[in-house]
Amino acid sequence: MLTMGEGNVMTSNNRFASPPQQPSSSSPGTIQNPNFNFIPFNSYSSIIPKEEHGMMSMMMMMGDGTVEEMMENGSAGGSFGSGSEQAEDPKFGNESDVNELHDDEQPPPAKKKRYHRHTNRQIQEMEALFKENPHPDDKQRKRLSAELGLKPRQVKFWFQNRRTQMKAQQDRNENVMLRAENDNLKSENCHLQAELRCLSCPSCGGPTVLGDIPFNEIHIENCRLREELDRLCCIASRYTGRPMQSMPPSQPLINPSPMLPHHQPSLELDMSVYAGNFPEQSCTDMMMLPPQDTACFFPDQTANNNNNNNMLLADEEKVIAMEFAVSCVQELTKMCDTEEPLWIKKKSDKIGGEILCLNEEEYMRLFPWPMENQNNKGDFLREASKANAVVIMNSITLVDAFLNADKWSEMFCSIVARAKTVQIISSGVSGASGSLLLMFAELQVLSPLVPTREAYFLRYVEQNAETGNWAIVDFPIDSFHDQMQPMNTITHEYKRKPSGCIIQDMPNGYSQVKWVEHVEVDEKHVHETFAEYVKSGMAFGANRWLDVLQRQCERIASLMARNITDLGVISSAEARRNIMRLSQRLVKTFCVNISTAYGQSWTALSETTKDTVRITTRKMCEPGQPTGVVLCAVSTTWLPFSHHQVFDLIRDQHHQSLLEVLFNGNSPHEVAHIANGSHPGNCISLLRINVASNSWHNVELMLQESCIDNSGSLIVYSTVDVDSIQQAMNGEDSSNIPILPLGFSIVPVNPPEGISVNSHSPPSCLLTVGIQVLASNVPTAKPNLSTVTTINNHLCATVNQITSALSNTITPVIASSADVSNQEVS
């Protein structure tokens, strides 16, 4: 026991009892500190609630004057919900009394404070208002105080106390849940550790190695084992008389097709006469393309094993990815439905009208990304666009196409060079809704002058339960794997911000599609011919995606049609579909062959920057393509004509004989026609070339597909023999039919610098011509220089013939721009 004062003993009975009231502070009944002569304790209620203990201690430290003010305002005493106030004490009722109290060294003990609670009606009224608005303004507080007979400060502090009480309750509930979750995680961790100790090796049955093994030790051990295996294979081959294959490199996470060819040795093509000292790589380092009739594959990944190890998402990252996916769907929906101020219209001197642009400041305010500041370093440019259209396909079929990488790349073959589903993170709870995929894609422009865009991204699909609309959103993965880079070494960087589409079903199998395309890209090596085309968003913008989607949906609808009455030489609907599939492979092969997809490198034939001719070589030895060495040449020319005019002239049979590289001056005759869209230019034709060498057993045929939309047009050809066409129409496998496509790509562009634009002037276009020839039937052959000269002459002649025909039949947009149109290679 502790003895204090004059023998007063502190016990459990009198520890919290109020001291007796004495007339003088020097009375022996007053408890004083024997060493410091502190002010005596004041009397308090015998029971102080736990919630009020901290506030009463604070009141003691602030002094009586502050205590009196707080008591008067109802901010102290009682519970937070009661709103009780202290009755005014005459001893401490004014400022003079407070001053006298400070002057007196030992003031008499204060009288016991009296408290009273608010009435039930007052509490009910304030509770009702609190449920509606926990933060009332001054007018509401004054009105409520007048109705309840309270002071405004009392109402103010009651609401403060009530909010504090609610916050404390929420914190306590959250702490309880966190503790429970922590206990569950600890239990699960213990369970997993126990299972880990019991694991055994599936090969030898021995126990697993506990602890982490350094990566460099594993790498050294693997190298040693491979050297030992190679040595044993060499010894075994001496005794067996046949070569023994050692163990192949470890398979990557994404297994390429067995048909995928590896990089072939150099063709050793001497290009020193044409190639000068410029940064383009030599054509002696060209790679062979994979067969295009199968799904899109990755190139050889032996140099990217470290990348593959970091590719997949761990379990804890999957949870974060799902949270990001839900927020990205909300962002996409808001970007589709919101106009100004998120999207603003700006005048464009290039097109002579207005364009829709994203307000970056408003976007950053509405959708702050945690990694935004780090990713915006360097020369990143933001490309954002949105559009909407109606397509002839229901939402279920569209969603299925977007979730299947092969179908997606097939539908957008002019944009998507290849695509792959890397990992299925979530397959959805009910149907496709809730599916989350990790994907890789390479996007292309149909020209070797524009580098492709490669990116890993997450694709999430969600259906709105109320409206039934589908949301398909792509968002970047760099928040999970900052070190993940595209597999090919490229000179630019590309990242997909939340982009995608909202699909709404309409009657008769149609769908309303709203599309938003939002990316950040660092383009450094786009040729000046395509610089404005790419920068304006016409190459990868939302309008281009929707234009291609509309056209492809019409093509698929035509492919599935069964009520075709006039089939011509095509005997059945099944034969019609087989010809359409063969033609689709023709277009897809052409698109990939004339771009920089799959890491193709191209060589320029001149040192001038305005030269747009590029050549490349490939060794072909796979089914579906002719065997041997293929030489490909591509050239791009600006023309002062609309892409519709150029498209119509090339398709016109009266002018097709001018294309010597295609028909050798002979006029073609259409023997079969398949319409695959509402536009008459969207069709497949089987052409018979009228030459003297034709006979009943030797007929030259050419398969042609043409397609056009607002984003551009394509015309692709390939010679085929009669037996191959008959094989396709009979329903046999057409993937082995060798095709070597050549053709034209036409895209609308804005006029170049220095040319005025008015509202009556149609847009100009870029004409890209791609020609492929089989230089040799032997894959190991080395094409000579004359082959390169020949294909270059054919290319220049084709461009000149088209330009001359356009100038003679169509009035150009700008008469004084003839000099600009002469930029084709001479």
Swiss-Prot record:
Q: Which residues form a coiled coil?
A: 165-189
- Phenotype of the disrupted gene, per the record: The double mutant pdf2-1 hdg5-1 exhibits abnormal flowers with sepaloid petals and carpelloid stamens in association with a reduced expression of APETALA 3 (AP3) in the epidermis and internal cell layers of developing flowers.
Q: Carries keyword Cell division?
A: no
Recorded hits in PROSITE patterns, A to Z, give: HOMEOBOX_1 (PS00027), HOMEOBOX_2 (PS50071), START (PS50848)
Q: Where in or outside the cell is it found?
A: Nucleus
The UniProt entry's GO biological process terms, in alphabetical order, are: maintenance of floral organ identity
Enumerate the Pfam families for this protein: Homeodomain (PF00046), START (PF01852)
Q: Name one GO molecular function term.
A: DNA-binding transcription factor activity
| CDD domains registered for this protein in UniProt | homeodomain, START_ArGLABRA2_like
Q: Biased-composition ranges for Basic residues?
A: 110-119
Q: Where is the START domain?
A: 314-558
Tell me the segments the record calls region Disordered. 1-34, 69-119
Q: Which InterPro entries match?
A: GLABRA2/ANL2/PDF2/ATML1-like, HD, Homeobox_CS, Homeodomain-like_sf, START_lipid-bd_dom
The domain of life is Eukaryota
Q: Name one GO cellular component term.
A: nucleus
Q: Which UniProt keywords apply?
A: Coiled coil, DNA-binding, Homeobox, Nucleus, Transcription, Transcription regulation
Which tissue types show expression of this protein?
A: Expressed in shoot apical meristem (SAM) with higher levels in L1 cells and the epidermal layer of young leaves. Expressed in the L1 of apical inflorescence meristems, early flower primordia, carpel and stamen filament epidermis, ovule primordia, nucellus and chalaze.
Q: Which residues bind DNA?
A: 111-170
| Composition bias, Low complexity | 23-34
Membership in a protein family = Belongs to the HD-ZIP homeobox family. Class IV subfamily.
Q: Tell me the function of this protein.
A: Probable transcription factor. Involved, together with PDF2, in the regulation of flower organs development by promoting the expression of APETALA 3 (AP3) in the epidermis and internal cell layers of developing flowers.
Q: What is this protein called?
A: Homeobox-leucine zipper protein HDG5
Specify the species: Arabidopsis thaliana
Gene coding for it: HDG5
